Regions:
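Glycine-rich FAD pyrophosphate-binding loop
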Residues: 23-42
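N-terminal Rossmann-fold NAD(P) dinucleotide-binding loop
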Residues: 15-16
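FAD/FMN-dependent oxidoreductases across multiple families
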Residues: 233, 237-321, 327-334, 338
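Beta1/beta-strand and adjacent pyrophosphate-binding region of the FAD-binding site
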Residues: 1-12, 30
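Short beta-strand to alpha-helix junction loop
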Residues: 91-112, 237-244
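C-terminal helical "tail/cap" subdomain of flavin- and related membrane-associated enzymes
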Residues: 320-423
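Predominantly flavin-linked oxidoreductase catalytic cores and closely associated redox partners
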Residues: 113-259
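N-terminal FAD cofactor-binding segment of flavoenzymes
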Residues: 40-80
Length: 423
């Protein structure tokens, strides 16, 4: 039995980034993955923040040759109003573009690039037991079709996503947000010939259907488009009235206005999926000889596409701290890991809540939105939620409400309202 420096559970974006960083620095790493790749997973819209993570871990070259659809920003639609936000208008220095991707293919490319570094990935292995006080550090038991295997290492990184391996095995407190939100989504076929008849066919777009209901359109470069509705569960009564989820989805499609007849007769590739009460978080992100990264640490919301960005950021952060600790540098996992991860999540949560209560809609579609404000907001939406020089990060818990109030005042009395100082 090989003794490793680190065992990583999960071969998604968080696990592959963490494993690659450690392997590049000479550490022995193994990945245990429950599923066989390629496999479907949601989270198809990426953020520029992650591009730097893939660059730093040497995974970017494998992605660059795939010809994924380039995402340079996002379009927001409210009735007849349209707002295009470009990542190039970014307050924080960093990447100004990314991709929108079919995750089954994308994650498989990442996994193969990780394996090419000499990191073994054991697919089809379900973790059934964890011992955190083993003489070697940790011992993990995993089972596949041929039986059980044991792995030992100095440290365990749980990047198992929604599977939440350690949450289940250790009985960790995983809390649901309880906000009543749900998502229904699917993939449809759109041939290049059909797309040639559509205006801006590759533009990733988000339409506000109601204050707390929105519709996503994410076109891929493989003639497939991801469609989804997200919002409070009261908007999904079509599920109760329809003979199938595809019929319910078609009923929901009739509510969108921003795409005309484009989705009048959708060619579903599979029956739409439904996820209820998807938001969750863990009280503790680390413990003796282990750390949680990615979605198993918590997930906020599909809006603004923060999932993969937090996955790669937390995976890289954990790997860097682990490498530092193995080189004699003291690491306080609470102060150095949990606090910054939760701080970034809190910033994004402010924007998510401002989206669902309508404040951000007001700001987005306000007439004559100042360029500096737009750049600072775009920086957050690009994933740079740790840039405290950005007032829309540093004052995230109050500045959006204040600005929305200013927009309301301006609409009522343009001569009175003043935009808050964001310098």
């Amino acid at each position: 039995m090989t003794a490793y420096d680190a065992i990583v559970i999960g071969a998604g974006p968080s696990g592959t980034v963490a494993a690659s960083y450690l392997r590049d620095r000479g550490h022995r790493v193994v990945i245990i993955e429950k599923q066989l790749f390629p496999r479907f997973v949601i989270g198809e819209s990426l953020l520029p923040l992650s591009m730097g993570h893939w660059e730093e871990t040497g995974l970017l070259p494998a992605l660059m040759v795939q010809k994924y659809a380039v995402k340079r920003g996002a379009r927001f639609i409210r009735g007849k109003e349209v707002l295009d936000l470009a990542f190039a208008d970014n307050f924080t220095e960093g990447w100004t573009w990314t991709w929108q991707v079919p995750r089954a293919h994308f994650d498989h490319v990442l996994a193969k690039a990780t394996e090419a570094k000499g990191i073994p990935i054991h697919y089809g292995h379900e973790v059934t037991g964890v011992e955190l006080d083993h003489p070697d550090g940790v011992r993990v038991t995993a089972r596949d079709a041929d039986g059980e295997k044991e792995f030992t290492a100095r440290f365990l990184i749980d990047s198992s996503g929604y599977g939440g391996v350690l949450v289940k095995l250790l009985g960790l407190k995983d809390r649901g947000a309880g906000n009543g939100r749900m998502a229904m989504f699917t993939h449809v076929t759109e041939t290049d010939a059909f797309r040639s008849t559509v205006k801006d066919p590759m533009q990733i777009s988000f339409e506000i259907v109601d204050t707390d209901l929105w519709f996503w359109v994410i076109p891929f470069s493989n003639e497939v488009t991801s469609l989804g509705f997200v919002g409070h569960q009261r908007h999904f009564d079509a599920l109760e009235r329809s003979p199938s989820t595809s019929a319910a989805f078609s009923t929901m499609l009739a509510r969108q206005q921003g795409f005309g007849p484009r989705f009048a007769t959708p060619q579903y590739l599979w029956e739409p999926k439904v996820i209820r009460e998807y938001a969750h978080y863990n009280d503790s992100l680390h413990g003796r000889n282990y750390v949680l990264t990615g979605n198993c640490a918590g997930f906020l919301d599909p809006v603004f596409s923060s999932g993969v960005a937090f996955a790669t950021n937390s995976g890289l952060m954990a790997a860097k701290l682990l490498h530092a600790s193995w080189n004699g540098i003291p690491v306080d996992w609470e102060k150095d890991y949990s606090v910054p991860v939760k701080r970034g999540a809190a910033v994004f949560k402010s924007y998510i809540e401002a989206w669902y209560n309508g404040d951000l809609h007001k700001i987005f579609f306000a007439p004559d939105l100042q360029q500096n404000i737009k750049e600072q907001i775009v920086s957050v939406l690009a994933g740079y939620v740790w840039d405290e020089k950005n007032p829309f990060v540093a004052r995230h818990d109050s500045i959006l409400r204040t600005l929305a109030n200013v927009v309301d005042m301006s609409a009522a009395s343009p001569k009175i309202a003043q935009v808050p100082n964001t310098q």
